[in-house]
């Protein structure tokens, strides 16, 4: 697994997201941990481990169907603004499974 390739993929597929300026050891560990968790989920859902094509598909799905994650939007209740998500958030097991199951689509 190339952490640099994953980082480049995030930049390519989700240019509107709040990105990273530097790939630190902590972020490399985040990528490796996410990849292991996502592999298990992909095997369960797709019958095969996640590869870069599968990761790109996940990010493209977000770009097309989960626009709210990539936009700053006002919060009607608090009057504050929800900020678009950072790359870190897209690399969590919880978000990955929710996106794969369609629970995070725009409504």
Task: Cite the ranges covered by each PLM segment.
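Append "and, occasionally, other polyanion-binding protein interfaces
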Residues: 1-107
């Amino acid at each position: 697994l190339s952490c640099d390739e994953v980082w480049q993929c995030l930049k390519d597929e989700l240019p509107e997201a709040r990105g990273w300026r530097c790939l630190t050891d902590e972020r490399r560990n985040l990528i490796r941990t996410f990849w292991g968790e996502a592999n298990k989920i992909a095997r369960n859902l797709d019958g095969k481990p996640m590869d870069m094509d599968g990761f790109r598909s996940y990010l493209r799905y977000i770009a097309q169907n989960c626009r709210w994650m990539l936009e700053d939007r006002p919060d009607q209740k608090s009057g504050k603004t929800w900020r678009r998500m950072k790359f870190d958030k897209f690399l969590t097991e919880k978000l990955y499974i929710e996106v794969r199951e369609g629970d995070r689509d725009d409504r």
